[in-house]
Amino acid sequence: MPTSHENALQQRCQQIVTSPVLSPEQKRHFLALEAENNLPYPQLPAEARRALDEGVICDMFEGHAPYKPRYVLPDYARFLANGSEWLELEGAKDLDDALSLLTILYHHVPSVTSMPVYLGQLDALLQPYVRILTQDEIDVRIKRFWRYLDRTLPDAFMHANIGPSDSPITRAILRADAELKQVSPNLTFIYDPEITPDDLLLEVAKNICECSKPHIANGPVHDKIFTKGGYGIVSCYNSLPLAGGGSTLVRLNLKAIAERSESLDDFFTRTLPHYCQQQIAIIDARCEFLYQQSHFFENSFLVKEGLINPERFVPMFGMYGLAEAVNLLCEKEGIAARYGKEAAANEVGYRISAQLAEFVANTPVKYGWQKRAMLHAQSGISSDIGTTPGARLPYGDEPDPITHLQTVAPHHAYYYSGISDILTLDETIKRNPQALVQLCLGAFKAGMREFTANVSGNDLVRVTGYMVRLSDLEKYRAEGSRTNTTWLGEEAARNTRILERQPRVISHEQQMRFSQ
């Protein structure tokens, strides 16, 4: 007789295969996740297991048997130059070759979403192969390439980088993105005041007004951590080493930790250190399975051909729910202050970020770049209820954009593997994109690592790091979607009422289970 567990598994699988809104490829993806999550979890200490079961720590539904890294950032330049013995490909000689080679390799780059989350620093990669092509000839090819990416790899966690330099490829990508207004690929422009021309940054601002992309990264800040050109911005704004990536992402629910604390002092001296240690134990267990039991790094041609290096993968030490944690702790101390409203509460938040950063910097991990994890302000997942993503301000009553940026900026110094705050601006900004440029430059001057904006009235909007069309959400439940992340946006709309709020959307990363 089938056990209750077997019956539950069959019911979940039956729900997937009979779903009227999933494509066959999407059904296959979710069925594979159910199979993986039916396997035993890597062995954990009792306290770490309890924290995971109680929801104080969340493993992002990555799966019980991590047989591939969460995020992979291949050295695409090496691939274009040398080709691949495994794929029986010669190196590229012109732009057509380069685009063709990339479209082939993308299908062999694994990730937590089963699609590539990093497409490369595309303008730097492709510009050497332009040769004698005119701008019009480049534009035609890039637009065709852009459409191909969205139609064959329909996952909005897929992420391309451009900048900081100007080039015909850079301009062609910006034009294609503004014209096509696609959900994927996502796009980050890396800004460097010593390199980026003013008119290029203005063009980037115009694109944001048009399609809420690209996200803008503060290049010099990232260069200090990874070296110039030694990193990529992927998925939901995770900054990671190039030719490596992110092995796993586990996150602390700071709200739940605050609920288990008797006072502010108890939080900082007992509960937060305790759960930080449990999170490291989970990270180590997951990475040990990936490195020692999955055989991924032993068998992948990406390793054998020098496109990735196992020593350049880093686990991400995530957190979320800072706003709720601060408010709870202030209540316990009798402090009449709210996060994002009063300086006393904001200072508690900064202290939490500083203590997390100190812990991560001083705590070795078994497997990882420089033997350390990297701190990440995680942007939430679609099923989160009652918590604010990362270190963001609570939704619904945010201050004006300048005050908002000044409030969150101090956190950015601590989160080396990514932190983001989404500003939603009135659509009147479209008449003055230079104001958007000044807002971005002011944010970077204040110390922010990233600048991200949605423009009210646009159909294409950002849900944390990835994009969805609001029009797609309305028809998804009836018709389904060819884009793998539309259902996430739809679930976020139900769970968080994002469509009922002022022009601003919640952020979340991939939820690794299907629910109708």
From Swiss-Prot:
- Origin: domain of life: Bacteria
Q: Which Pfam families match?
A: YjjI-like
Q: Which GO terms describe its biological process?
A: anaerobic respiration
* Family matches, as InterPro entries: Glycyl_radical_YjjI-like (IPR016905)
> Which parts of the chain span the membrane according to its record?
none
The text of the family note is: To H.influenzae HI_0521.
Protein's recorded name: Uncharacterized protein YjjI
Species of origin: Escherichia coli (strain K12)
Phylogenetic lineage: Bacteria, Pseudomonadati, Pseudomonadota, Gammaproteobacteria, Enterobacterales
